[in-house]
Amino acid sequence: MYYKFSGFTQKLAGAWASEAYSPQGLKPVVSTEAPPIIFATPTKLTSDSTVYDYAGKNKVPELQKFFQKADGVPVYLKRGLPDQMLYRTTMALTVGGTIYCLIALYMASQPKNK
């Protein structure tokens, strides 16, 4: 048996399954058909041409070989000096922010004496 909250009696009342699963005051949508799609610009199907839209070369296989090389260097430092600078800057800002937050929490926890 299914139950539904009655807004009139403010109690649970027996109900059919279709009534119990639909919210009060809302009816299920009758039309399940999707409206036609309208495009602002004409679309091109992917099967129309086999030419790539970009002029660049696919670098993914080369980068996969480069990053999967077993040379003992972490992936986030593989590209040399720029990665080292970015890593060190990120770590410095993280440590500095943590220290700043701890100092702010300490100062906020101390009562002010008048």
UniProtKB/Swiss-Prot annotation:
Predominant subcellular localization, coarse grouping: mitochondrion
| InterPro entries in UniProt | COX7a, Cyt_c_oxidase_su7a-rel_mt, Cyt_c_oxidase_su7a_sf, Cytc_oxidase_su7a_met
For this protein, the parts annotated as crossing the membrane are 82-107
Q: Where in the cell is it found?
A: Mitochondrion inner membrane
Domain of life (superkingdom) = Eukaryota
Q: Which residues carry this modification: N6-acetyllysine?
A: 69
Q: Name one GO cellular component term.
A: mitochondrion
* Annotated transit peptide: 1-55
The UniProt GO MF terms for this protein read: cytochrome-c oxidase activity; protein-macromolecule adaptor activity
Q: Does the keyword Transmembrane apply?
A: yes
Topology relative to the membrane: Single-pass membrane protein
**Subunit details:** Interacts with the mitochondrial respiratory complexes III (CIII) and IV (CIV), promoting their association.
What family, per the record? Answer: Belongs to the cytochrome c oxidase VIIa family.
This protein is called what?
A: Cytochrome c oxidase subunit 7A2-like, mitochondrial
- Provenance organism: Homo sapiens (Human)
Q: What is the lineage of its organism?
A: Eukaryota, Metazoa, Chordata, Craniata, Vertebrata
> What gene, per UniProt, encodes this protein?
COX7A2L
